[in-house]
Amino acid sequence: MAVSTSFSGAKLEALLFKSASNSSSTRNLSSSHLPGFCKSIRTRRILFQRTGVSSFTPFKCELASSDVLVQNDEIDPPKSSNLSALEQLKTSAVDRYTKERSSIVVIGLSIHTTPVEMREKLAIPEAEWPRAIGELCGLNHIEEAAVLSTCNRMEIYVVALSQHRGVKEVTEWMSKTSGIPVSEICQHRFLLYNNDATQHIFEVSAGLDSLVLGEGQILAQVKQVVKVGQGVAGFGRNISGLFKHAITVGKRVRTETNIAAGAVSVSSAAVELALMKLPEPSHATARMLVIGAGKMGKLVIKHLVAKGCTKMVVVNRSEERVTAIREEMKDVEIIYKPLTEMLSCTAEADVIFTSTASESLLFTKEQVKDLPPVGHDVGGLRLFIDISVPRNVGACINNLEDVRVYNVDDLKEVVAANKEDRLRKAMEAQSIITEESKQFEAWRDSLETVPTIKKLRAYAERIRTAELEKCLSKMGDDIPKKTRRAVDDLSRGIVNKLLHGPMQHLRCDGSDSRTLSETLENMHALNRMFSLETEIAVLEQKIRAKVEQNQK
């Protein structure tokens, strides 16, 4: 990857010194509490969140500047100077092969950096992902996009024509759609670029970034991103390739390591939390109510059964899903109730699990305060375990004396116990992720030669056609078709023979880094020798076209 040169040396040096000073305490905290492996994953999140500087690539100027450009007016260039980063880059003579290409960027907020109160406002339902992709790709500096929105994270992946401008536009879009001020989003978000972004989605897919390390549900959610993205124009080649490769990595990690062995899911952690809060003698007798029979609700039911629960009430919009679950678990008494009877069922329950896609609260303080008290055999407290995002249960209910509400952020208490063992297993997974990240970046680099191949062939074809016409005109109009065809075939054969060598040097599958480096050097050499259009000009044209389209 070439280094962008958007900043002068003095300004860059000052910025890096300031960022290093600000992040020193964070580094000390990370190293003192986490093992080496965990530090390599988490430090990247923390440093991006607080400084915008990657601990791995401190000399990526746009990367180092992206957070500051959005939030700090002192470092923004004067408004009178409207030179874009691309124009500055064109005049730079740092490296004869230096150029800027589209960057993969992730703008994210997760359970590690952001409270559930903010995540629920930013959450995008799966049905809205295509619309969100369309709106994101309508921004001036965004080419491709994908949305990964779960109960633990809200992450937007984009291919940006300019890093800091793309981040600024996406952050403003997030603010507009959620109603959260840009400044507040910037306090909690993390930013990752190119290889760091690649490693992040691979870690996510492998379950290394989950609250419950190694859990399998996130892989299904990554698959769903690809499924929903198929046919959506903005889910382009780079983003599609990234997520498909992430699925491969997630499968490989689970196959080649034992990270998934004994791992708990969010649903099982919710059940464990409920049992931790109940007196042990009441585990078999507590009255259980599950609201929502979707994927999460079904898993809650399965884990309750695994813990010895033989009777429960399930409230759902329709009976069809509950019937299907009942067929799977014929030895368990599962009683279906419609949503209209939700409050009456709650009055008769000791523990209530909520896992619906409702965007509004199902339970408010006014609804719960008049419910009859629960027995002392279950501790005298009615428990609400809310694993929905947005939340289904109002936090103010916790103010009632005989009620306790727990949400997904409270599950950390459960997973802490067996996290150390899975961290050891995760070390094995990290080597796989590093290897796969290199392969993906090499594949992406190899794509750069495709436009040059097309341009070189088109250039040769223009010359062939022009010279063929000259030849045929000199031969006269009465030449036989057979002769005309033979001359045409001759010209094509000569061109193909001449192009064979250069084309071979431009084709690379990305598997060999040495070959890839030579291929990219050959590409730049051919661009210069034949005055082919440069990648910088392509980026400028794309940005100009998007701006003009948005102004119509």
Curated annotation (Swiss-Prot):
Q: Where does NADP(+) bind?
A: G292, A293, G294, K295, M296, G297
Extract one GO BP annotation from the record. Answer: protoporphyrinogen IX biosynthetic process
Locate the site labelled Important for activity: H200
Say which domain of life the source belongs to.
Eukaryota
| MF annotations from Gene Ontology | glutamyl-tRNA reductase activity; NADP binding
Q: In which tissues is it expressed?
A: Primarily in cotyledons and hypocotyls of greening cucumber seedlings.
**Which positions in this protein are listed as binding substrate?**
T150, C151, N152, R153, S210, E215, G216, Q217, Q221
Q: Which Gene3D superfamilies match?
A: Glutamyl-tRNA reductase, N-terminal domain, NAD(P)-binding Rossmann-like Domain
Question: Which keywords annotate this record?
Answer: Chlorophyll biosynthesis, Chloroplast, NADP, Oxidoreductase, Plastid, Porphyrin biosynthesis, Transit peptide
**Residues forming the catalytic site:** C151 (nucleophile)
As recorded in UniProt, its EC number(s) are 1.2.1.70
Please give the function described in this protein's UniProt entry.
Catalyzes the NADPH-dependent reduction of glutamyl-tRNA(Glu) to glutamate 1-semialdehyde (GSA).
UniProt lists the family membership as follows: Belongs to the glutamyl-tRNA reductase family.
- Xref: NCBIfam families: hemA (TIGR01035), PRK00045.1-3 (NF000744)
Q: What is this protein called?
A: Glutamyl-tRNA reductase 1, chloroplastic
